[in-house]
């Protein structure tokens, strides 16, 4: 169970996410989708029940805001890889040859010597020009800063990736590129989106947050619509049968 203030968002909800799933979280605005993300990030705690993540799982997420800074775009994206930054700092502060060799060995194992190329590839895919690579974060508009946050999240080594409306500030080319990137992503993906085509192209499971419950559907958005329509039709048939039965009982009682 989860509340925001006195408002219940989830009540006796159950959700199991399996390794490697690509799960789209859908539901009306205000239903609690972003709060569920905050729960997975440890920013909120459950009032009742348990939340379990595998030990050692690395969780990456797309921040919704970014402060203006003089840090250039490519460095901002690389900052998402904290392990790389730790190794880089170790190399810069090493005090002897053995220590330096050890840090360089870690850098090689981390594939850190190619990290700038990786960061630039992410930025190019999301629509940035080559001249943007050295442009300070403060030089970009709000929408482009959100793209920087997205690139930084993709740069972060992760087992679980959380993306909240990742296509909101993307044009079609960038959206299609992101779709391809996420299809190749090896970890577990949970994302929020109102873009049905994007959900269809990425998700293999849909979780519908509705009336404080979570309902899981296999497949993409098109499959979800079909399955949900079938379930609603079955529920209507059951309801109609119940009404007929109630009417029969009432008729019998009034005899």
Q: PLM features: what roles do these ranges have?
A:
Residues 240-255:
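Short cytosolic helices in intracellular loops of multi-pass membrane proteins
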Residues 1-241:
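ABC ATP-binding cassette signature C-motif
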């Amino acid at each position: 169970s989860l509340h925001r203030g006195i408002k219940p968002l989830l009540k006796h909800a159950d959700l199991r996410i399996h390794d490697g799933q690509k799960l789209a979280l859908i539901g009306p605005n205000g239903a609690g989708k972003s709060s569920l993300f905050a729960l997975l990030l440890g920013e909120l705690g459950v009032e009742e029940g348990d939340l379990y993540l595998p030990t050692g799982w690395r969780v990456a997420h797309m921040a919704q805001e970014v402060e203006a800074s003089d840090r250039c775009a490519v460095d901002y994206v690389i900052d998402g890889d904290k392990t790389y930054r730790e190794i880089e700092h170790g190399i810069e502060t090493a005090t002897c040859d053995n220590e330096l060799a050890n840090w360089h060995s870690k850098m090689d194992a981390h594939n850190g010597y190619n990290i700038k190329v990786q960061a630039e590839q992410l930025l190019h895919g999301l629509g940035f020009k080559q001249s943007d690579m050295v442009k300070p974060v403060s030089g970009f508009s709000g929408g482009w800063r959100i793209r920087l946050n997205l690139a930084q999240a993709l740069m972060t080594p992760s087992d679980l990736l959380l993306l909240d409306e990742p296509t909101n500030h993307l044009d079609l080319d960038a959206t299609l590129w992101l779709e391809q990137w996420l299809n190749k992503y090896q970890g577990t993906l949970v994302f929020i989106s109102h873009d049905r085509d994007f959900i269809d192209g990425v998700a293999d499971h849909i979780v519908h947050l509705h009336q404080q419950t979570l309902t899981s559907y296999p497949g993409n958005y098109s499959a979800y619509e079909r399955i949900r329509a079938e379930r609603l039709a079955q529920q209507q048939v059951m309801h109609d049968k119940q009404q007929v039965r109630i009417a029969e009982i009432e008729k019998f009682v009034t005899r």
